[in-house]
Amino acid sequence: MKYKKKIFSILENLEKKNIEKDIINIKNLYLQKEKYVTQLSLLKDYQNEYLIKLKSKIELGICLYQWRNYNNFIFILYFLIKDNEQKIKKNQKILEKSLKQYSKNQIKLKTWNYLYKKYKKKEIKKILLVEEMISDEFSQLKNLAEGSCYNV
């Protein structure tokens, strides 16, 4: 029966390690998401700033090559913003998966804890039962030994 105790403790330790890995993974994903969101806001700010500059330059008169440069830069910013938004969505999906896995591992850990506690209670009952049987046998032998003295 000792092997059951070892199995439960091994399974419990495995789940604890899985939970720790999940927590680290979730923290990293949150940090990545935060980084992407700040990048996105910076890119949008740059885009708005350059759109305002381009508008004012157009009103004042702008050379064709300057207009192309501004337009190309704003176009590149547009694609960078779209790419960053896709990264945020992908990160969010991975984060949701990781949170689900974390909750599954928590449930497994609670299950192993419950089964281990149930096993311990059962083992304690067995030990108490054996002790009670030994005590009963001892008292029976003691009574028989005392009774045999009177029969002689």
UniProtKB/Swiss-Prot annotation:
What is one Gene Ontology biological process annotated in the Swiss-Prot or TrEMBL record? Answer: chemotaxis
Whether Membrane counts among this entry's keywords is: yes
How does the record say this protein sits in the membrane? Peripheral membrane protein
Recorded GO cellular component terms are: bacterial-type flagellum; plasma membrane
Q: List the disulfide bonds.
A: none
Location in or out of the cell: Cell membrane
InterPro entries found in the cross-reference section: Flag_assembly_chemotaxis_eff (IPR053716), Flagell_FliJ (IPR012823), FliJ (IPR052570)
The UniProt transmembrane annotation reads none
**Predominant cellular place of this UniProt entry's protein:** membrane
Asked if the record carries the keyword Magnesium, the reply is no
The alphabetized UniProt keywords are:
Bacterial flagellum biogenesis, Bacterial flagellum protein export, Cell membrane, Chemotaxis, Membrane, Protein transport, Transport
Family listed: Belongs to the FliJ family.
Q: What does this protein do?
A: Flagellar protein that affects chemotactic events.
What is the protein's given name?
Flagellar FliJ protein
Q: Which organism is it from?
A: Buchnera aphidicola subsp. Schizaphis graminum (strain Sg)
The gene that this protein is the product of is: fliJ
